Amino acid sequence: MAQRGFLSAELGQYLLLISLLSLLVVPLARYGNQLLSAWHIERAVHRLIDKSQQHYAKSVLMSRCLTQTRLSMQVLGEVAQQNGVTYDVSYRQSGVPRTPPSAIVVSVTLDQSMKGLINRFQADVIQGATLQFYAPLRFTLPDFQQLNIETGCIR
């Protein structure tokens, strides 16, 4: 059987396959990169929450007072800006004086190149490019009889 035309059917199939792959690789790579970036940010948020819990427990042991106000990235020994993401951590104070903080707040601000990731997170508050994650502060005092209610400190 004589071949007619410039391209054989097999060569046409290969060209079609290569062109489809070249069209799909770029979006798939971009999607994979976004998933990887979101995973790194989630890991960083969980690490900051864990470090904040440990810092609070250590601060209570050192100061013997449940009321703690000082929490920041510098106190935790973490870098605030990493790969286009700015992190901030603080305590969420309840309105009652001389009581422990009610939660840990981790704020994540994404720069312009990372704004496409905002919908990939389940943040408690989303304001523009800033995501806020709340985590309850888990700390139990073994013996509440030794707590001075007037000062919020352990006797």
Model regions and ranges:
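Hydrophobic beta-strand residues in large extracellular and virion-surface proteins
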Residues: 48, 52, 87-91, 104-108
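N-terminal single-pass transmembrane signal-anchor helix
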Residues: 1-37, 41
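N-terminal alpha-helical signal peptides/signal-anchor transmembrane segments
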Residues: 28-32, 41-63
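Short, surface-exposed interaction loops/tails
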Residues: 102-155
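Short, glycine/small-hydrophobic-rich surface segments
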Residues: 52-81
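Short amphipathic beta-strand and strand-loop transition segments with alternating hydrophobic
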Residues: 85-99
